[in-house]
């Protein structure tokens, strides 16, 4: 019996061995068939977009996964641009190497969305990680928390590595959330700027006047005054501004280096500040005091000085000012002072600039011979007779020879010494002749005065001086016409240029008269609009009295000449700062005593004027539940202010006076001093509602440090007041006024929160649906309805398309895209890329499909879980003999009518998936590369890439928690193939065929042996 058994085994050995060997060949060749292609030709794809790197998230429960072993043999010029799932580790190297995946998926619970820009460096490995990887482009990492999958769901993990891209092809396309937040914070921190309200300004009246008469003498300190009466529209806010433009022959600063214009004030409260913009443009900007003011008017007066650079000679000048299209003009003669002269020489001078901050000034002196006469042994000196700084440094003196004609020298005493055609610097030639001293003086000695010279002086004056006077003096001897024993006597010419600084409130006698600069401001308070009722029993009136001291300033002025002859006409240069200090008003509201109010007035006598006060009034309790306190900067009411100022002081906000004298041979002095007066009348109209009440207590006056605070209280019931006359006298009156009035306000029923996204390039989605962004080759198209929540991640570039309706918007980049019909009952996580160069196809109704390639096979079925779609452009492993699978036959390109191919099944027969098993290829229908094969069914299908006979093209669908979508941009495509076209796969198929035949042969032998054995 043992022999029979041994014989039986030996007899069946050939057949069993054949079956075993054939099965091993089939299985082995099937497992290794994917590694055949990569060494001949790779896919050529021109792409402009970035590849997105995704961090896949597996199911929260551990599932058994069937992972095909992938041998990556492609050569990469850059790092792989996809980050695989947690269950797979992909190593890309130059040589082929297998990648083994574990059998269990790891859970993930990441909830944040991270978008990071990574370095453009190439690294040979891409490993599974939750942190950023160094890629050849911008990395986009999406971590979302998935929902728990059903127990019957099997996750198929198939790793795909995108086509490599070089770093130069990478372009940013994702706006990070941090950038959005920073942009929003920047917009929140944006400072609100005002608007130009020039068009809302009405010029009720405008004029340009010459206070000194029908002409202007700039060297005598004369100027013109621009007067405006303006009316503004309601609704002005802080920061709003209006502009007006002056002609170029005037300026607002004279010789002062301070470039500013007076403020518009309401009492001591600044309502608008002025600034010089250049080119004659003046701008006034309103402060926050303008808020809630209506019926705003302003009286503006600005001093205008003749510009010596523009107006260099005597003559008529047209002075203009334009505001809101309305031009105010005046034509007036300009007359300059010729200086002091005799028959031989002329001396003239002018202070060019004056800087109070640095205590410096500049002076220009003309020294020129007259009538062709020359002088010998001439000495010119410059000295500070008043305001000399003995401890100061040496002045800077430059001597220039005038090369032009004498009559062309500017009468305005202006010298553009940088013009070398007219001015030659001869300071170095005066070595030994020019000397300077520490006290600010200089002396220049000339052997002969036969040329015209211009002397430019820069020096200091003593800080704190109330007067500055610079004297230019010339000593000389006329040239003798005939040589004789008679000696001609010498002569002396003296010219003074002085500055007298005094308070704007001063007034003085002089031929120049008054210089007035007023800025009155009127308005009505709008803070209680629509909330108060009643009226005052008597109209409130403001009374302002100005008692100004007319005592002229005491100015020491000296001129001296030689008794031989000639005369001197000297003057003091005047400087005035253009700021106007408005008169502040202290008032007390005096209304009819029959209504129970205070009768009387408050009188304040002061030397300097900022006055504020406090006033407390209670409104009728019938109309208000409570009293609301607020500060009011207006000055309603009546009162009396006596202002006295007779002090000479150096102040930034000050004007200047003039002293002009003429000395004849009899040494008589004419004193023609000029002073300026600031007279600012503020008229306030403040109509407030009726008040009835009774005084509850006395008025308390507290005077400390020259600061007066006046409190008054009015009751809420009718009655008679016990107030009397209140008098307050202080040295430096600074009265704070506080008015407490009630008002009605609204109420917010709840908190309101507003959030705004300022991104302009975001797409607009009006309805939901599935927006699928797919990067790879074989990607199913999903249609149907979603019962779960959709999460969208979008790109905020400007090139995004606009989706008007929902449905399924699918962005597809590659060739073979199957189509899946059914319903999705769970959450789909969709990532979208909307590059500018993608075409858009609309397939009826709500399903917009955006794709770029040829074939779109169609797969029908229904998915009950969350779908994660991954595609591999290489055919999968054929199933084991128990569950044979037949790859789908490629079809010719007919993109107009999509077809519905059968759903492919996963390669593991133990855990079958819902899609139907594809049929194996039919060897009877050969297909040459590049030629389409007739379709297996009558209805046309989406175009697919032609393959060789025996090649398996099977879309692989992995059911996971996330739709994997990386959509690289393709701008231009020429003839390109998706997979390498090599013969490796054909040889693999032949090997599999050989193995199969070997197995069949073995089975046949076994069957034959069995029959023979029975026989």
Swiss-Prot record:
Gene Ontology CC, one term: extracellular region
Signal peptide: 1-36
Domain of life where this protein originates: Bacteria
Per-repeat ranges for B-: 546-575, 576-605
Gene3D superfamilies to which the protein is assigned, alphabetical: 2.60.40.1280, 2.60.40.1290
Region annotation 2 X approximate tandem repeats: where it falls in the sequence: 546-605
Region of interest called 5 X tandem repeats, Pro-rich (WR), as start-end residue ranges on this chain: 876-945
Record's keyword terms, sorted: Cell adhesion, Cell wall, Peptidoglycan-anchor, Repeat, Secreted, Signal, Virulence
Stretches for region Disordered: 75-199, 596-623, 741-815, 828-953, 966-992
Region spans: Fibrinogen/elastin/tropoelastin-binding: 194-512
Location of the region described as Ligand-binding A region in the Swiss-Prot/TrEMBL record: 37-512
WR repeat intervals: 876-889, 890-903, 904-917, 918-931, 932-945
Entry keyword Repeat: yes
Pfam families: Big_8, Fn_bind, Gram_pos_anchor, SdrG_C_C, YSIRK_signal
Residue ranges, compositional bias (Basic and acidic residues): 112-126, 179-193, 828-839
Chain segments carrying region 4 X approximate tandem repeats: 746-875
Coiled-coil annotated residue ranges, if any: none
Role: Promotes bacterial attachment to multiple substrates, such as fibronectin (Fn), fibrinogen (Fg), elastin peptides and tropoelastin. This confers to S.aureus the ability to invade endothelial cells. Promotes adherence to and aggregation of activated platelets.
NCBIfam families assigned to the protein according to its UniProt record, in alphabetical order: LPXTG_anchor, YSIRK_signal
Protein name: Fibronectin-binding protein A
Gene that this polypeptide is encoded by: fnbA
């Amino acid at each position: 019996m043992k022999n029979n058994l041994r014989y039986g085994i030996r007899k069946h050995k050939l057949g069993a061995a054949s079956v075993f060997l054939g099965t091993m060949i089939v299985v082995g060749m099937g497992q290794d068939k994917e590694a055949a292609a990569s060494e001949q030709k790779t896919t050529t794809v021109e792409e402009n977009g970035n590849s997105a790197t995704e961090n896949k998230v597996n199911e929260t429960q551990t599932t058994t996964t069937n992972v095909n072993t992938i041998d990556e043999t492609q050569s990469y010029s850059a790092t792989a641009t996809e980050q695989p799932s947690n269950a797979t580790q992909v190593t890309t190297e130059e040589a082929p190497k297998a990648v083994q995946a574990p059998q269990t998926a790891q859970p993930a619970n990441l909830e944040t969305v991270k978008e990071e820009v990574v370095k453009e460096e190439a690294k040979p490995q891409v490993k599974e990680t939750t942190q950023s990887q160094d890629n050849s482009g911008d990395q986009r990492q999406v971590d979302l928390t998935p929902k728990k999958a059903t127990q019957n769901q099997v996750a198929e993990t198939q790793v795909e590595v995108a086509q490599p891209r070089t770093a130069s092809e990478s372009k940013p396309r994702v706006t990070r959330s941090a950038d959005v937040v920073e942009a929003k914070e920047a917009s929140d921190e944006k400072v609100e700027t005002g608007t130009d309200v020039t068009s809302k300004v009405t010029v009720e009246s405008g004029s340009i006047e010459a206070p000194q008469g029908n002409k202007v003498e700039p060297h005598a300190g004369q100027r013109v005054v621009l007067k405006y009466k303006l009316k503004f529209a309601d609704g002005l806010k802080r920061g709003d501004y209006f502009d007006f433009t002056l002609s170029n022959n005037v300026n607002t600063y004279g010789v002062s280096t301070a470039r500013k214009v007076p403020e518009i004030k309401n009492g001591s409260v600044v309502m608008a500040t002025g600034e010089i913009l250049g080119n004659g443009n003046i701008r006034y900007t309103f402060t926050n005091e303008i808020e809630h003011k209506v019926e705003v008017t302003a009286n503006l007066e600005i001093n205008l000085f003749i510009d010596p650079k523009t107006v260099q000679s005597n003559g008529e000048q047209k002075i203009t000012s334009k505001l809101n299209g309305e031009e105010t003009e005046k034509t007036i003669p300009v007359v300059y002072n010729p200086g002091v002269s005799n028959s031989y020489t002329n001396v003239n001078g002018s202070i060019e600039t004056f800087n109070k901050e640095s205590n410096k000034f500049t002076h220009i002196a003309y020294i020129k011979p007259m009538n062709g006469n020359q002088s010998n042994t001439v000495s010119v000196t410059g000295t500070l007779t008043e305001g000399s700084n003995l401890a100061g440094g040496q002045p800077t003196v430059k001597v220039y020879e005038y090369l032009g004609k004498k009559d062309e020298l500017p009468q305005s005493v202006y010298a553009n010494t940088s013009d070398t055609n007219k001015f030659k610097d001869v300071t170095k030639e005066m070595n030994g002749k020019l000397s300077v001293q520490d006290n600010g003086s200089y002396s220049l000695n000339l052997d002969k005065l036969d040329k015209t010279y211009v002397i430019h002086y820069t020096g200091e004056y003593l800080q704190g001086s109330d007067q500055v006077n610079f004297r230019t003096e010339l000593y000389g001897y006329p040239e003798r016409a005939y040589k004789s024993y008679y000696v001609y006597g010498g002569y002396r010419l003296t010219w003074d240029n002085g500055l007298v600084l005094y308070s704007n409130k001063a007034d003085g006698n002089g031929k120049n008269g008054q210089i007035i600069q007023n800025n009155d401001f009127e308005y009505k308070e709008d803070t209680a609009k629509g909330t108060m009722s009643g009226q005052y029993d008597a109209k409130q009136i403001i009374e302002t009295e100005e008692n100004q001291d007319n005592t002229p300033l005491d100015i020491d002025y000296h001129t001296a000449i030689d008794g031989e002859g000639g005369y001197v006409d000297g003057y003091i240069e005047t400087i005035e700062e253009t700021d106007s200090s408005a008169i502040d008003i202290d008032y007390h509201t005096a209304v009819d005593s029959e209504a129970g109010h205070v009768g009387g007035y408050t009188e304040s006598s002061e030397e300097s004027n900022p006055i504020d006060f406090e006033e407390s009034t209670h409104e009728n309790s019938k109309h208000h539940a409570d009293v609301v306190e607020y500060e009011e900067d207006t000055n309603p009411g009546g009162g009396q202010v006596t202002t006295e100022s007779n002090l000479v002081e150096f102040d930034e906000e000050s004007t200047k006076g003039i002293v002009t004298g003429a000395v004849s041979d009899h040494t008589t002095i004419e004193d023609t001093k000029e002073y300026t007066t600031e007279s600012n009348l503020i008229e306030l109209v403040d109509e407030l509602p009726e008040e009835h009440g009774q005084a509850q207590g006395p008025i308390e006056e507290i005077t400390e440090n020259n600061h007066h605070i006046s409190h008054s209280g009015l009751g809420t019931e009718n009655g008679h007041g016990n107030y009397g006359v209140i008098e307050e006298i202080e040295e430096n009156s600074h009265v704070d006024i506080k008015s407490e009035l009630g008002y009605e306000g609204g109420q917010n029923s709840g908190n309101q929160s507003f959030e705004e996204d300022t991104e302009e390039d975001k797409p607009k989605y009006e309805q939901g649906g599935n927006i699928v962004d797919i990067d790879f080759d074989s990607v199913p198209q999903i249609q149907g309805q979603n019962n779960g929540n959709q999460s969208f991640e979008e790109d905020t570039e400007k090139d995004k398309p606009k989706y008007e309706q929902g449905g399924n918007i699918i962005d597809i980049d590659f060739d073979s895209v199957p189509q899946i019909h059914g319903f999705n009952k769970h959450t789909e996580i969709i990532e979208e890329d909307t590059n500018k160069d993608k075409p858009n196809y609309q397939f009826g109704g709500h399903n917009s499909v955006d794709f770029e390639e040829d074939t779109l096979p169609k797969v029908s079925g229904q998915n009950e879980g969350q779908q994660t779609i991954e595609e591999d452009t290489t055919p999968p492993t054929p199933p084991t003999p128990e569950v044979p699978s037949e790859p789908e036959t490629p079809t010719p390109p007919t993109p107009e009518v999509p077809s519905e191919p059968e759903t492919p099944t996963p390669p593991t027969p133990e855990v079958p998936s819902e899609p139907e098993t594809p049929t194996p290829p039919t060897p009877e229908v050969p297909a040459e590369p590049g030629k389409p094969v007739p379709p297996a069914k009558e209805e046309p299908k989406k175009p697919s890439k032609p393959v060789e006979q025996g090649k398996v093209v099977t879309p692989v669908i992995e059911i996971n928690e996330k739709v994997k979508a990386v959509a690289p941009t393709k701008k231009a495509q020429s003839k390109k193939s998706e997979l390498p076209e090599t013969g490796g796969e054909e040889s693999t198929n032949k090997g599999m065929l050989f193995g199969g035949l070997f197995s069949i042969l073995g089975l046949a032998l076994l069957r034959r042996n069995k029959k023979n054995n029975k026989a």
